[in-house]
């Protein structure tokens, strides 16, 4: 198990749906979330998929590297997630 930070930007129009989809995906791949922060709605620097604003969510979690790869692939397919970034924490 490794520790990761995961940040997502979701569509404003699907705020609750996107958040539940993220949580379901993490649970499905046995990702253990240790901390969760809702950074709120923010204006994007440039439009992403024709969206001017997005909802930012930040998670600290631990998981198997293979599980994180699967989560990232599912996030790419999900239409409610505009962007996501996973960073491995060392230490």
Curated annotation (Swiss-Prot):
Binds together with bS18 to 16S ribosomal RNA. One of its GO terms (cellular component) is ribosome. Keywords: Ribonucleoprotein, Ribosomal protein, RNA-binding, rRNA-binding. This is Small ribosomal subunit protein bS6. InterPro entries: Ribosomal_bS6, Ribosomal_bS6_sf, Ribosomal_S6_plastid/chlpt, Transl_elong_EF1B/ribsomal_bS6. It holds the Pfam family Ribosomal_S6. GO terms for biological process: translation. Coiled coil: none annotated. One of its GO terms (molecular function) is structural constituent of ribosome. Belongs to the bacterial ribosomal protein bS6 family. Gene3D superfamilies: 3.30.70.60.
């Amino acid at each position: 198990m490794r520790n990761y930070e995961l940040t997502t930007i979701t569509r404003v129009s699907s705020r609750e749906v996107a958040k539940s989809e993220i949580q379901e995906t993490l649970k499905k791949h046995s990702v253990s979330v240790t901390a969760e922060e809702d950074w709120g709605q923010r204006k994007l620097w440039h439009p992403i998929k024709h969206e001017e604003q997005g909802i930012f969510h930040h998670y600290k979690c631990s998981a198997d590297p293979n599980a994180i790869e699967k989560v990232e692939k599912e996030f790419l397919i999900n239409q409610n997630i505009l962007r996501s970034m996973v960073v491995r924490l060392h230490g």
